[in-house]
Design a protein with these regions (language model features):
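A positional/architectural concept
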Residues: 8, 12-57, 61-66
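Glycine-rich hexapeptide-repeat left-handed beta-helix
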Residues: 1-13, 46, 54, 60-62, ...
Length: 190
């Protein structure tokens, strides 16, 4: 068994995407520029599509799976953190899904939101943009747009993925990384 025949699988993965050797990708998957798929991550798209935007990171042990009627869609500059599950749901741009959180079929997480570690967003739930969600079942506990902070986190993971692609596992230390962070924080257009 093992990996399916590549000729029968539709994958559109940008050439700049870093995928850990232990990650497993099955089915119709699109991944945008600068994204990363970390160790032991599994993406399965048997009957619907998985679409992952640009500069998004799927961290260690993440599971992305489609529902029977629902694709899994993750926007640009998102962080889906360790052991989180996105199952047939939509995560809009600039979101962070916390460690061990679960987002179920038909749910929509609005732009710039955070789903707290361990939260469960149940089927069909619509979370407004700029929300913090916590609990089981997940409920909005705070309204604040975290798009800027979430985007910075995604940029940091982009930096780390570039280093891993070169075989460097200590990318977040030293002056070069600090310069990268400072440059990212400079006001635009000045």
């Amino acid at each position: 068994m093992g990996q399916p025949d590549a000729s029968r699988v539709l994958k559109q993965i940008h050439e700049s995407v870093w995928i850990a050797p232990s990650a497993e990708l099955y089915g119709a998957i699109t991944i945008g520029e600068g994204s990363s798929v970390w160790p032991q991550c599994v993406i399965r798209a048997e009957c619907q599509q998985v679409r992952i935007g640009s500069h998004t990171n799927l961290q260690d042990f993440v599971m992305i799976h489609v529902g029977y009627d629902d694709p899994a869609t993750i926007g640009d500059f998102c962080s889906i953190t360790h052991r989180a599950v996105v199952h047939g749901a939509t995560v809009e741009d600039d979101c962070l899904i916390g460690i061990g959180a679960i987002v179920m079929d038909g749910a929509v997480i609005g732009r710039g939101s955070i789903v707290a570690p361990g939260a469960v967003v149940t089927e069909g739930t619509r979370i407004p943009a700029g929300s913090v969600v916590a609990g089981v079942p997940g409920r909005v506990i705070k309204s604040r747009d975290y798009a800027t902070e979430n985007r910075e986190n995604a940029w940091n993971y982009w930096w780390n993925a570039q280093a891993y692609a070169r075989g460097e596992q200590r990318a977040w230390e030293g002056p070069e990384f600090r310069r990268f962070q400072e440059k990212r924080r400079e006001p635009r257009g000045s």
